[in-house]
Swiss-Prot record:
A motif (SH3-binding) lies at residues 100-106. Disruption phenotype: Mice are lean, resistant to high fat diet-induced obesity but without the induction of insulin resistance and have a higher metabolic rate than wild-type mice. This is Proline-rich nuclear receptor coactivator 2. It is found in: Nucleus; Cytoplasm, P-body. Interacts with UPF1/RENT1; preferentially interacts with hyperphosphorylated form. Interacts with DCP1A. Interacts with many nuclear receptors including ESR1, ESRRA, ESRRG, NR3C1/GR, NR5A1, PGR, TR, RAR and RXR. It comes from Mus musculus.
């Protein structure tokens, strides 16, 4: 036979007791949170908190300009002529590959000798060349 399998059958009374405890704990945490938010609102009413509306109003009064950026002459000089930032980059030549032109065959590496069978008939070479060209054909 099975040999002592045990099943945990929950007691309905203990389940209700744990639910009551959870509800009481939730109620306590809600009470604590609401008292903390009330304190925070009172602090803001006294003028100790940060008021984003006041900061926005002050920014409108200043014409949307911040004082810290207007005092920094280096920052303004860089912004007044953005073409100076890219001038040195544009004068340099790009040394990378040009993808508009295919590379010449002399530049391409040779395949290893064991890849290509040495004794090929000329017709086999032509067939292989045709197949390779069709495989490598790039559609524009």
């Amino acid at each position: 036979m099975g040999g002592g399998e045990r099943y945990n059958i929950p007691d309905p009374q203990s389940r209700n007791a744990s639910k009551n405890q959870e509800q009481q704990n939730r109620q306590k945490s809600k009470d604590q949170n609401s008292s903390q938010t009330k304190i925070a609102h009172k602090k803001k009413e006294r003028g100790h908190g940060y008021n984003p509306a006041a900061a926005a109003w002050q920014a409108m009064q200043n014409g949307g300009k911040t004082k810290s950026l207007s005092n920094n002459s280096n920052w303004n000089a860089g912004l007044s002529s953005p073409s100076l930032l890219f001038k040195s980059q544009a004068s340099q030549n790009y040394a990378g590959a040009k993808f508009s032109e295919p590379p010449s065959p002399s530049v391409l590496p040779k395949p290893p000798s064991h890849w290509v069978h040495v004794s090929l008939n000329p017709s086999d070479k032509e067939t292989m060349t045709f197949q390779l060209k069709t495989l490598l054909k790039v559609q524009v």
